[in-house]
Amino acid sequence: MDGSCDCIEPLWQADDLLVKYQYISDFFIALAYFSIPLELIYFVKKSAFFPYRWVLIQFGAFIVLCGATHLINLWTFAIYTKTIAVVLTVAKAATAVVSCITALMLVHIIPDLLNVKLRERFLKDKADELDREMGIIRTQEETGRHVHMLTHEIRSTLDRHTILRTTLVELGRTLALAECALWMPTRSGSALQLSHTIYNSAAIGSVVPINLPIVSKVFNSNRVVKIPHTSPLASITADKSRYVPPEVVAIRVPLLHLTNFQINDWPELSAKSFAVMVLMLPPDSAREWRPHERELVEVVADQVAVALSHAAILEESMRARDLLMEQNIALDAARREAEMAICARNDFLAVMNHEMRTPMRAIVSLSSLLLETNLSAEQRLMVETILKSSDLLATLTNDVLDVSKLENGSLELEIAPFNLHSTFTDVVNLIKPVAACKRLSVVVTLAPELPLHAIGDQKRLMQIILNVAGNSIKFTKEGHVSITASMARPDALRGPHEPDYHPVVSDGFFYLAVQVKDTGCGISPQDMPHTFRKFAHPENAGKWNSGSGLGLALSRRFVSLMEGNIWLESEGVGKGCTAMFFVKLGMPEKPNANLRRMAPHPLQPNQGAGGPDALSISIMDSNPRVPRVRYQSSV
């Protein structure tokens, strides 16, 4: 051979070395190709879910065929037969077919595999997001736990100072604060005063003007507000930071219902007042306020406001209870005094009643005995007047002295048939001597339709007429007094000042209307509402016309018992007065013989039964300065 040829001699020692290395390499390649499918089959069987099993089978077949070609290649390094060449050719052809099919399948599989990677990234992001949410949830749970604990501590008492002290201490312990303080409004409301701190590192009572911009900023927000560490509100500790200033926040605390709320003597505050809570983190640290810590402070501030409101309401309730107890004690003492006074009054009335009834019975008895003797008509009229006056005085004594009986409503009417005309005759006989002393004329007019007999309480009716007519005579210096009696019309039963009076007209009953009119001193509009009160005296009555002041009050009570109504009318002082009353009386079907015998003589105009000149009577006034007057008959 030519010396320039770069060929390897077949029998050269180097050829054997290369063949040897190729032989070994093909062997290990074939071994690796055969082991890879076994590993794939093993892990696929172990996998519970794998969507590309046919791809793995094709890929395994491709690897096996590749390994087979390398294995068959081991026999080609020496002289080999045609059979080996055929087998090698078939193996390579099969490998080519399988590799092409696998390559085509990978065109569809690779995008899916890429999507799997994207899904993996998406799931990883979702997992990270879930981790963050779980962290937030854990933080919220922790915050809620702290809020529940703080709320429990705050609401464990209803003392306002204890509430504030507990709030600051628990916040400082939960949030690891360097200091926590509360600024309260002063009495004037123009400044904030330091009232509570945790460690008392600042002077209690320090004052900050309320018109500072930072204070207005805190008041105008219901959230936590970050304030500079150099702010006057942040001057709650004496410790100064060397390197990093502390983080300081403030929040307003509404004073919802705090009256008498002040420092040591808490001033009265309106419902729109605010306190300021200041919270400071430790200085010289990299710690900052986190969102859940801010939320915790906001919730606690609201709880403190509610707790302070409840405490204030409780204190007000306790003050009201104490005041009520004092009033009850005073009322109980007054009740005991009133009971003692009532007992003393009843004892006095009982004694006076007994002492007045004893001589009254003697007068009635002697008058009754005199009526049984031979008397002239004039003497008999005088004795009858004495007897009736004594009987009426006994009735008046019973009513006036038994005040408790009148006040508790236990007074009852004595219903019986009586002669109605005779009642007016008796009234005239009683009042005409008094009118004659004052030279007053008394005119009595009885309507023709007025029945002769009626059913009711004659003594009470007579007492009403005497009280009203007696008042007219008492307050009239000159002129006349007229008494008019008739059956009342239904439309005239209501007085001008009694809109709530509703009379009931029924069969067998009628309303007696009595009008007493005088030309006396009259009643002023100011005195009109007080005329029916007990012990009431008109200002224009004068000291000579003073009396007990019970007449009209008793008359109104009797009129009410008789289902009637009474009122007064006057145009003013010096223009006279008109008294009008209605009482309900029964109408008897057949008057008995006694009533017929009691029928009086008809009253003549301007004259009562007997006339003024037919009497000789002594008249005594309740005023001791009025002299005794004796009116003697001129006949």
UniProtKB/Swiss-Prot annotation:
The keyword Phosphoprotein applies. It is an enzyme of class 2 (transferase). GO terms for cellular component: endoplasmic reticulum membrane. One of its GO terms (molecular function) is ethylene binding. Its EC number is 2.7.13.3. Binds 1 copper ion per dimer. The keyword Lipid metabolism does not apply. It catalyses: ATP + protein L-histidine = ADP + protein N-phospho-L-histidine. CDD domains: HisKA. Residues 159-308 form the GAF domain. GO terms for biological process: negative regulation of ethylene-activated signaling pathway. Cu cation binds at C66, H70. Keywords: ATP-binding, Copper, Disulfide bond, Endoplasmic reticulum, Ethylene signaling pathway, Kinase, Membrane, Metal-binding, Nucleotide-binding, Phosphoprotein, Receptor, Transferase, Transmembrane, Transmembrane helix, Two-component regulatory system. It comes from the Eukaryota. Residues 351-589 form the Histidine kinase domain. Ethylene receptor related to bacterial two-component regulators. Acts as a negative regulator of ethylene signaling. May play a role in the regulation of flowering by up-regulating GI (GIGANTEA) and RCN1 and regulate starch accumulation by down-regulating the alpha-amylase AMY3D. Pfam families: ETR1_N, GAF, HATPase_c, HisKA. This is Probable ethylene response sensor 2. Its cofactor is Cu cation. The chain crosses the membrane at residues 24-44, 59-79, 94-114. Gene3D superfamilies: 1.10.287.130, 3.30.450.40, Histidine kinase-like ATPase, C-terminal domain (3.30.565.10).
